[in-house]
Amino acid sequence: MEALKRKIEEEGVVLSDQVLKVDSFLNHQIDPLLMQRIGDEFASRFAKDGITKIVTIESSGIAPAVMTGLKLGVPVVFARKHKSLTLTDNLLTASVYSFTKQTESQIAVSGTHLSDQDHVLIIDDFLANGQAAHGLVSIVKQAGASIAGIGIVIEKSFQPGRDELVKLGYRVESLARIQSLEEGKVSFVQEVHS
Amino acid sequence: MEALKRKIEEEGVVLSDQVLKVDSFLNHQIDPLLMQRIGDEFASRFAKDGITKIVTIESSGIAPAVMTGLKLGVPVVFARKHKSLTLTDNLLTASVYSFTKQTESQIAVSGTHLSDQDHVLIIDDFLANGQAAHGLVSIVKQAGASIAGIGIVIEKSFQPGRDELVKLGYRVESLARIQSLEEGKVSFVQEVHS
């Protein structure tokens, strides 16, 4: 998605060979118009897949997921990373290991909002080692729902998350695929469009 | 806002005289079309106020704030409740006391995304005791920005948050004002429309 790649080039800050900071339009400040375009793009790629629900994770997945849900006309459920007083019943949970924080944490979705009739599109802001995506996949499967695919705003293709998900048979649609952050520069995977 | 009130009546769960659970469309599952209508309503109420930025707080404020930002054509910044590795520089912080959790926590916004040239609309999902709103007000003022008003999706009018903010001179626009949750029933404040 060219508009996203240009935004990353213009505003992304390469903090290290591993870390790209996009706090000006996705992870802290949000560009609503770009989120709408991202939502339209995900909706277009999954338009014929019979999606009934989008599952994402707080906080940075919410904006792209809601814009996708608006376009597809389906609800969005966001997994919680932190305990909520009113989120208590019928919890589906998964452990997610954070390589950056080096901590294991629980994510949770109420089973009330996912059923075995659902065909789910999982959306997240970043895909790196794939821990959050695997956690969301686990939760969706616990509900007995099926998975149409995984939509990622920014993929760090030099980390193993994508390949592992693809090997497991999941369709991964990433709107910007980063080949490398070396030498302080963002290089994208060259994709051949059919 | 009648569509929101009907949704609360149909899907809200009164957990006690103090707590209303709206996990089916706002706090856990999100109804994107309703969020768009909420965004349109906030945008309409603040259309002539010269808003340059929207400030909200993760996670449930994000969806209504982004829809409002989309309509007004301005960026959204969400305050973080939890430490982020990439959010480090130039932090504006405030302490927020949670009556429900009985804990004090820090919220933070990077000063990079707020300036003394900004005229801010603060948006949040709930207004009860007003602690989160006061925290956001403090952060916006630390940046030297001015505040156009505070947009609230659901106000618990029987708690003191609104009155305190109005006494301090802030304009509070709440789309659904709840008079009482007694006897397991949602009663709205009767408003006279001019």
Swiss-Prot record, chains A, B:
<dbReference type="GO" id="GO:0032265">
    <property type="term" value="P:XMP salvage"/>
</dbReference>
<comment type="subunit">
    <text>Homodimer.</text>
</comment>
<protein>
    <recommendedName>
        <fullName>Xanthine phosphoribosyltransferase</fullName>
        <ecNumber>2.4.2.22</ecNumber>
    </recommendedName>
</protein>
<dbReference type="Pfam" id="PF00156">
    <property type="entry name" value="Pribosyltran"/>
</dbReference>
<dbReference type="GO" id="GO:0005737">
    <property type="term" value="C:cytoplasm"/>
</dbReference>
<dbReference type="GO" id="GO:0046110">
    <property type="term" value="P:xanthine metabolic process"/>
</dbReference>
<feature type="binding site">
    <location>
        <position position="20"/>
    </location>
    <ligand>
        <name>xanthine</name>
    </ligand>
</feature>
<keyword id="KW-0328">Glycosyltransferase</keyword>
<dbReference type="GO" id="GO:0000310">
    <property type="term" value="F:xanthine phosphoribosyltransferase activity"/>
</dbReference>
<dbReference type="InterPro" id="IPR029057">
    <property type="entry name" value="PRTase-like"/>
</dbReference>
<comment type="pathway">
    <text>Purine metabolism; XMP biosynthesis via salvage pathway; XMP from xanthine: step 1/1.</text>
</comment>
<dbReference type="InterPro" id="IPR000836">
    <property type="entry name" value="PRibTrfase_dom"/>
</dbReference>
<feature type="binding site">
    <location>
        <position position="156"/>
    </location>
    <ligand>
        <name>xanthine</name>
    </ligand>
</feature>
<feature type="binding site">
    <location>
        <begin position="128"/>
        <end position="132"/>
    </location>
    <ligand>
        <name>5-phospho-alpha-D-ribose 1-diphosphate</name>
    </ligand>
</feature>
<comment type="function">
    <text>Converts the preformed base xanthine, a product of nucleic acid breakdown, to xanthosine 5'-monophosphate (XMP), so that it can be reused for RNA or DNA synthesis.</text>
</comment>
<comment type="similarity">
    <text>Belongs to the purine/pyrimidine phosphoribosyltransferase family. Xpt subfamily.</text>
</comment>
<keyword id="KW-0660">Purine salvage</keyword>
<dbReference type="InterPro" id="IPR050118">
    <property type="entry name" value="Pur/Pyrimidine_PRTase"/>
</dbReference>
<dbReference type="GO" id="GO:0006166">
    <property type="term" value="P:purine ribonucleoside salvage"/>
</dbReference>
<feature type="binding site">
    <location>
        <position position="27"/>
    </location>
    <ligand>
        <name>xanthine</name>
    </ligand>
</feature>
<keyword id="KW-0808">Transferase</keyword>
<keyword id="KW-0963">Cytoplasm</keyword>
<dbReference type="InterPro" id="IPR010079">
    <property type="entry name" value="Xanthine_PRibTrfase"/>
</dbReference>
